[in-house]
Amino acid sequence: MDPPLKDGVIMRQHRISIFKKRRRSMKDIKILGVDIAKDVFQLCGIDEWGKVIYTRRVKRAQYVSTVASLKVGCVVMEACGGANHWYRTFMGMGIPTQLISPQHVKPYVKSNKNDRNDAQAIAEAASRASMRFVQGKTVEQQDVQALLKIRDRLVKSRTALINEIRGLLQEYGLTMARGAKRFYEELPLILASEAVGLTPRMKRVLNCLYTELLNRDEAIGDYEEELKAVAKANEDCQRVQSIPGVGYLTALSVYASVGDIHQFHRSRQLSAFIGLVPRQHSSGNKEVLLGISKRGNVMLRTLLIHGARALLRHVKNKTDKKSLWLKALIERRGMNRACVALANKNAPIIWALLTRQETYRCGA
């Protein structure tokens, strides 16, 4: 029987085993899943067999230096707030980095939800060969996306303000014609009239709201001028704008949300990315197609459909092949479905123009 080891020898062997395990962890990390937050980041590294070999919780100030000290095959984070900044940071350092959609991570979260389990789920999801990743954005793309979102918020708040003024006037028995154009024509007349039954206090309130509305219009105009200048200076936006029914807002939304067009190997993939293809609920030999999936960027899909709707208003007297197809589609399926069909037709055209670096050529 071997003599018992002394406590000092046992502690020394334990420290050696921990050191060897730590060295192995730093060398063999294939995927480093990171659950990012504002101040604290949870790291989870797995090897080529999917086994967890490294876990650590670090502060924001230590995050970059900690990842840089590890020899990792790939850093993976959820595509959430701040992810694009870290994506650009690590890619600039030469560290392969991927972003993954949170909806693809959720099925891999085991037991309770916490930062440790989330980081492990991110690493495990990223290890799947069929996993789909999110394209990281450049600084320019984020600038354009910010401008588009701010403009969209201002437009929605302007609509809400117009409806608020209409509702207030209706309580005093005053109704206005439908449409923003008629609203801007009639409101100054109402405020200037003495025979409409409004109290002086209410007139002051409505004048303040009207001033706020005009300021909102001015802000929207400033952002639109900025967006037009960006679209004019971007060659890809000019190519996309050459398509009938596609304006500068749609072209910029494509630039900001799609990113590298070469991530899509077929034109159909871009339509699916935008959410313009039917949802499928099939089983066995029975194929069931439902309405459009509505996945992806809501703003881009909305702009494509609204652009298609604007184009359909002018096909009535046209006799070219595309216009005849659209008129037949409107008669058979209605205006709304025709708008979606045209938007779904424009998405592959956008893919073709950007991949081939060409301008739209109208067919006979």
From Swiss-Prot:
MF annotations from Gene Ontology: DNA binding; transposase activity
Keywords in alphabetical order: DNA recombination, DNA-binding, Transposable element, Transposition
One example of a Gene Ontology biological process annotation: DNA transposition
InterPro entries membership: Transp_IS110-like_N (IPR002525), Transpos_IS110 (IPR047650), Transposase_20 (IPR003346)
Family: Belongs to the transposase IS1111A/IS1328/IS1533 family.
Role, per record: Required for the transposition of the insertion element.
UniProt-recorded name of the protein: Transposase for insertion sequence element IS1111A
